[in-house]
Swiss-Prot record:
This is Retinol dehydrogenase 7. One of its GO terms (molecular function) is all-trans-retinol dehydrogenase (NAD+) activity. Pathway: Cofactor metabolism; retinol metabolism. The lineage of its organism: Eukaryota, Metazoa, Chordata, Craniata, Vertebrata. The gene is Rdh7. The keyword Transmembrane does not apply. Substrate binds at S164.
């Protein structure tokens, strides 16, 4: 019986592999709009798709980032300045895209722009600390998508949203994990709604990678600011030893991050170019063999693992 099951699983994987390798035709005529192209995943994906001959519309936060990207790509790639927290910026970028794609519509929308800080123990934060991250990582994704959807629907195209393994398993306080859970939920509802119009929605769930999101200097400065703004009662309960150990633990996690960003951008590219993209892509060995399996464990077991491996506050019971 087990041999039959193994054979069935093997056959299914072969069929899936064959199915997923079928590529969309006329890629050179397809327009893809990508947010967050100054650096990291967005920057690499823009260059990757440009090399493949696609029409890349890259949104950068800064003119400097846009100039650097243009210097490394062909004349096909065009850039626009976009702040995903500002409605007027999103509306202007949408009009800019509309003028370029015309009646063909927008084949791909990649919501990649994101930030990680403020990030740390929840009790060290204020409402504005959560809001600043949610404004970029979740509300920015939603507003950009709502504005671009008519163009994507016209092309019967793709929406690719960058979530995280932290959208499956919340390890850190602050708005980051909350925002990524929100991206997962938004993408799920969007996928079910847009299937009637031939639009496919894919979610990318990277593990740890070396980008601006995991920049240790930025994370360290953020943690110091959060500690400084915490109340005296909170400081006494957690203690300076906890603060220092927490920072070291975060540094250890950052040091384990992969530098091979193509593991993520290859997933993004597949979601845009395959005739049969996946619903979810897990990128990185830590995602596949730690975070995702952990997310499937009963809650009491995953809580126990995290409790065993975490730093304890000074007044912990």
């Amino acid at each position: 019986m087990w041999l039959y099951l193994l054979a069935l699983v093997g056959l299914w994987n072969l069929l899936r592999l064959f199915r997923e390798r079928k590529v969309v035709s006329h890629l050179q005529d397809k327009y893809v709009f990508i947010t967050g192209c100054d650096s990291g995943f967005g920057n690499l994906l823009a260059r990757q798709l440009d090399r493949r001959g696609m029409r890349v519309l890259a949104a950068c936060l800064t003119e400097k980032g846009a100039e650097q990207l243009r210097s490394k790509t062909s004349d096909r790639l065009e850039t626009v300045i976009l702040d995903v927290t500002k409605t007027e910026s999103i509306v202007a970028a949408t009009q800019w895209v509309k003028e370029r794609v015309g009646n063909r519509g927008l084949w791909g929308l990649v919501n990649n722009a994101g930030i990680s800080v403020p990030m740390g123990p929840n009790e060290w934060m204020r409402k504005k600390d959560f809001a600043s991250v949610l404004d970029v990582n979740l509300l920015g994704v939603i507003e950009v998508t709502l504005n671009m959807l008519p163009l994507v629907r016209k092309a019967r195209g793709r929406v690719v949203n960058i979530a995280s393994t932290m959208g499956r398993m919340s390890l850190l306080g602050g708005g980051y994990c909350i925002s990524k859970y929100g991206v997962e939920a938004f993408s799920d509802s969007l996928r079910r709604e847009l299937t009637y119009f031939g639009v496919k929605v894919a979610i990318i769930e990277p593990g740890g990678f070396k980008t601006n999101v995991t920049n240790m200097e930025r994370l360290s400065d953020n943690l110091k600011k959060l500690w400084d703004q915490a109340t005296e009662e909170v400081k006494e309960i957690y203690g300076e030893k906890f603060r220092d150990s927490y920072m070291k633990a975060m540094e250890s996690l950052v040091n384990m991050c992969s530098g091979d960003l193509s593991l993520v951008t290859d997933c993004m590219e597949h979601a845009l170019t395959s005739c049969h993209p996946r619903t979810r892509y897990s990128a990185g060995w830590d995602a596949k063999f730690f975070y995702l399996p952990m997310s499937y464990l009963p809650t009491f077991l995953s809580d126990a693992v995290i409790y065993w491996g975490s730093v304890k506050p000074a007044r912990a019971l």
